[in-house]
Amino acid sequence: MQFKIKKSFIISLFIAILSFQNNLYSGPTTLDIDDFGIISLMYHRFEENKYPSTNIKLKDFKEHLNIIRENNIRFVNPNNFEQNLKDNKNQRKVLLTIDDGFSSFYENAWPILKEKKIPFILFVSTREVGSNNYMTWDQIKELDKENFVEIGNHSHTHEYLVDESYEVIKNDIEKSISIFKNELGKNSKFFSYPFGEYSLKFKSLIQSLGFKYAFGQHSGVMDETKDLYELPRFPINEKYGEI
């Protein structure tokens, strides 16, 4: 099957993801010809066409998964994330992440990932769980039972916390941790900064609260040399998701 790669798709870095050994992307951050490691893709909504900046069409999502498989790129299981960071010699890997826990993910993408047992992290903001267009705790617990799924912490309010005081940020994250423990029996070791934005105080707080990894929204390949509290991810949406 031949794919006609659109310019927007190249810009989105998906081609770079599939071509660690070729500098096909010439944007703000290029991948070196010898780069190996983990690329993280970030998705949000599925088949919610009125939100093009955060939505992906299901047919495109399926094609992404197919391309990854056909190019012998490994899906990273978050349960083995630390080992995957260390063991990167001559290996190309992809970590799937889904932010916010929208109902459209559960209804459209989850059945596909479940059937094929494709690993991923689902980041949820605890205040929104159970509200309109968001997953419920029962649905989240269903996913949490699977050994290829990790439920990550995405704050409580999903507000823009970077400019807030240390106490405001601390109260928000501690609230989310408390709810995680009440609902899932544990907090996650993974954190996703709301809007991908963080500061030194924010990063320091996340580390002090026991998280092992935190993700932003910037270009880069992950390996053991990277700051574990500034891990990169590439957002994939309708604009940059078609092939």
Predicted segments, located by residue:
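Short beta-strand and adjacent tight-turn residues that come in two discontinuous sequence segments
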Residues: 123, 214-216
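Bacterial N-terminal signal peptides that target proteins for export
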Residues: 2-10
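Bacterial N-terminal signal peptides
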Residues: 11-19
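Short secondary-structure boundary segments
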Residues: 195, 217-219
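Noncatalytic alpha-helical scaffolds and linker/capping helices
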Residues: 99-100
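Metal-dependent polysaccharide deacetylase catalytic core of the NodB/CE4 family, i.e.
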Residues: 36, 41-52, 85, 91-94, ...
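N-terminal pre-catalytic segment of deacetylase/amide-hydrolase enzymes
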Residues: 20-94, 240-242
